[in-house]
Regions:
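Binding-interface segments
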Residues: 2-176
Length: 176
Protein backbone atom coordinates (compact mmCIF):
# COMPACT_ATOMS: atom_id res chain seq x y z
CA UNK A 1 0.00 0.00 0.00
CA UNK A 2 1.50 3.29 -1.09
CA UNK A 3 0.96 6.43 0.96
CA UNK A 4 0.28 9.71 -0.77
CA UNK A 5 2.73 12.33 0.44
CA UNK A 6 1.52 15.18 -1.74
CA UNK A 7 0.72 18.46 -0.05
CA UNK A 8 -2.20 20.49 -1.29
CA UNK A 9 -1.48 24.19 -1.15
CA UNK A 10 -4.23 26.77 -1.38
CA UNK A 11 -3.91 30.41 -2.40
CA UNK A 12 -4.70 31.29 1.21
CA UNK A 13 -1.79 29.15 2.44
CA UNK A 14 0.51 30.83 -0.08
CA UNK A 15 -0.48 34.26 1.26
CA UNK A 16 -0.03 33.09 4.86
CA UNK A 17 3.36 31.54 4.01
CA UNK A 18 4.54 34.75 2.36
CA UNK A 19 3.36 36.87 5.29
CA UNK A 20 5.14 34.85 7.99
CA UNK A 21 8.24 33.56 6.25
CA UNK A 22 7.20 29.93 6.01
CA UNK A 23 7.13 27.83 2.88
CA UNK A 24 3.76 26.76 1.52
CA UNK A 25 4.46 23.19 2.60
CA UNK A 26 5.35 24.33 6.13
CA UNK A 27 2.06 26.21 6.45
CA UNK A 28 0.22 23.08 5.32
CA UNK A 29 2.05 20.96 7.90
CA UNK A 30 1.32 23.47 10.68
CA UNK A 31 -2.36 23.73 9.73
CA UNK A 32 -2.77 19.95 9.73
CA UNK A 33 -0.86 19.25 12.96
CA UNK A 34 -0.29 21.88 15.67
CA UNK A 35 -3.03 24.19 14.37
CA UNK A 36 -5.51 21.57 13.19
CA UNK A 37 -9.02 22.79 12.49
CA UNK A 38 -8.15 26.49 12.34
CA UNK A 39 -9.59 28.88 9.81
CA UNK A 40 -7.18 30.84 7.60
CA UNK A 41 -7.68 33.89 9.85
CA UNK A 42 -7.02 31.85 13.02
CA UNK A 43 -3.98 30.24 11.42
CA UNK A 44 -2.64 33.70 10.52
CA UNK A 45 -3.26 34.87 14.09
CA UNK A 46 -1.50 31.79 15.50
CA UNK A 47 1.52 32.24 13.21
CA UNK A 48 1.70 35.90 14.17
CA UNK A 49 1.79 34.90 17.85
CA UNK A 50 4.52 32.33 17.07
CA UNK A 51 6.57 34.98 15.33
CA UNK A 52 6.01 37.68 17.96
CA UNK A 53 7.03 35.44 20.89
CA UNK A 54 9.78 33.72 18.88
CA UNK A 55 8.54 30.16 19.47
CA UNK A 56 8.72 27.33 16.95
CA UNK A 57 5.55 25.34 16.24
CA UNK A 58 7.56 22.61 14.46
CA UNK A 59 9.19 21.49 17.69
CA UNK A 60 5.99 21.95 19.71
CA UNK A 61 7.19 24.95 21.66
CA UNK A 62 3.77 26.39 20.82
CA UNK A 63 0.52 24.97 19.44
CA UNK A 64 -3.17 25.72 19.27
CA UNK A 65 -6.51 24.00 19.04
CA UNK A 66 -10.21 24.78 19.04
CA UNK A 67 -12.20 24.05 22.19
CA UNK A 68 -15.74 22.65 22.23
CA UNK A 69 -17.15 26.19 21.88
CA UNK A 70 -15.00 26.83 18.79
CA UNK A 71 -12.64 29.22 20.61
CA UNK A 72 -9.01 29.24 19.52
CA UNK A 73 -6.68 28.34 22.39
CA UNK A 74 -2.94 28.92 22.05
CA UNK A 75 -0.52 27.13 24.36
CA UNK A 76 3.20 27.35 24.96
CA UNK A 77 4.66 24.13 26.30
CA UNK A 78 7.49 23.49 28.72
CA UNK A 79 9.95 23.49 25.81
CA UNK A 80 8.66 26.91 24.74
CA UNK A 81 9.11 28.38 28.20
CA UNK A 82 12.54 26.75 28.46
CA UNK A 83 13.58 28.18 25.08
CA UNK A 84 12.55 31.66 26.23
CA UNK A 85 14.37 31.23 29.56
CA UNK A 86 17.56 30.07 27.84
CA UNK A 87 17.58 33.27 25.79
CA UNK A 88 17.55 35.34 28.98
CA UNK A 89 20.89 36.48 30.38
CA UNK A 90 19.58 35.99 33.94
CA UNK A 91 18.66 32.30 33.46
CA UNK A 92 21.09 30.07 35.34
CA UNK A 93 19.59 26.61 34.94
CA UNK A 94 16.76 24.40 36.10
CA UNK A 95 16.65 21.37 38.34
CA UNK A 96 13.71 19.04 38.85
CA UNK A 97 12.81 15.65 40.24
CA UNK A 98 9.83 13.48 40.89
CA UNK A 99 8.94 12.83 44.53
CA UNK A 100 7.84 9.36 45.66
CA UNK A 101 6.12 8.10 48.80
CA UNK A 102 9.30 6.60 50.31
CA UNK A 103 11.55 9.59 49.58
CA UNK A 104 12.69 11.97 52.29
CA UNK A 105 11.27 15.28 51.11
CA UNK A 106 10.66 18.68 52.64
CA UNK A 107 10.02 22.02 51.05
CA UNK A 108 10.39 25.45 52.66
CA UNK A 109 9.09 27.98 50.12
CA UNK A 110 9.66 30.99 52.39
CA UNK A 111 13.37 30.22 52.58
CA UNK A 112 13.72 28.81 49.03
CA UNK A 113 14.85 25.45 50.34
CA UNK A 114 14.13 21.89 49.28
CA UNK A 115 15.57 18.81 50.90
CA UNK A 116 15.10 15.65 48.85
CA UNK A 117 16.93 12.39 49.36
CA UNK A 118 16.30 8.80 48.36
CA UNK A 119 18.36 5.67 48.34
CA UNK A 120 18.42 2.42 46.44
CA UNK A 121 15.34 1.01 48.17
CA UNK A 122 11.98 0.97 46.40
CA UNK A 123 10.90 4.60 46.12
CA UNK A 124 7.19 3.88 46.02
CA UNK A 125 4.48 5.63 44.05
CA UNK A 126 4.99 9.05 42.51
CA UNK A 127 3.25 11.73 44.57
CA UNK A 128 4.51 14.83 42.78
CA UNK A 129 7.48 16.72 41.40
CA UNK A 130 9.32 19.94 42.03
CA UNK A 131 11.34 22.28 39.88
CA UNK A 132 13.81 24.98 40.79
CA UNK A 133 14.67 27.70 38.27
CA UNK A 134 17.92 29.47 39.08
CA UNK A 135 18.55 33.09 38.16
CA UNK A 136 21.83 34.98 38.17
CA UNK A 137 20.12 38.14 39.40
CA UNK A 138 17.73 36.90 42.06
CA UNK A 139 16.22 34.21 44.19
CA UNK A 140 15.42 30.82 42.68
CA UNK A 141 11.82 30.00 41.85
CA UNK A 142 10.50 26.77 43.34
CA UNK A 143 7.31 25.05 42.22
CA UNK A 144 5.69 21.78 43.26
CA UNK A 145 3.12 19.83 41.22
CA UNK A 146 0.85 17.23 42.83
CA UNK A 147 0.65 14.01 40.79
CA UNK A 148 -2.99 13.22 41.61
CA UNK A 149 -4.10 16.69 40.56
CA UNK A 150 -2.40 16.67 37.15
CA UNK A 151 -2.50 12.99 36.15
CA UNK A 152 -5.57 12.54 33.96
CA UNK A 153 -4.59 9.05 32.83
CA UNK A 154 -3.62 9.90 29.25
CA UNK A 155 -1.17 7.61 27.44
CA UNK A 156 1.95 9.71 28.10
CA UNK A 157 1.07 9.82 31.80
CA UNK A 158 0.75 6.02 31.85
CA UNK A 159 4.03 5.34 30.04
CA UNK A 160 6.19 8.20 31.42
CA UNK A 161 4.60 9.43 34.66
CA UNK A 162 7.79 10.84 36.21
CA UNK A 163 8.67 12.85 33.10
CA UNK A 164 5.14 14.20 32.75
CA UNK A 165 4.82 15.47 36.33
CA UNK A 166 8.33 17.00 36.17
CA UNK A 167 7.30 18.85 33.00
CA UNK A 168 4.32 20.32 34.88
CA UNK A 169 6.52 21.54 37.75
CA UNK A 170 9.13 22.90 35.32
CA UNK A 171 6.49 24.74 33.30
CA UNK A 172 5.09 26.44 36.39
CA UNK A 173 8.55 27.45 37.61
CA UNK A 174 9.63 28.72 34.18
CA UNK A 175 6.44 30.80 33.83
CA UNK A 176 7.41 32.79 36.89
Amino acid sequence: MEQNSEITVSKTNIKIADAFGYSNAEVQVISSTVAKGTTPMELSYFLNVCKSVDLNPFIKEIWCYKDNRDNLLIFAGRDGFLAKAQKSTSFNGIRSSEVCTNDEFSMDIANNKITHTFGIKERGAIVGAYAIVFRKDGEPTIEYADFKFYNKGYNAWKSHPAEMIKKVAETHALKK
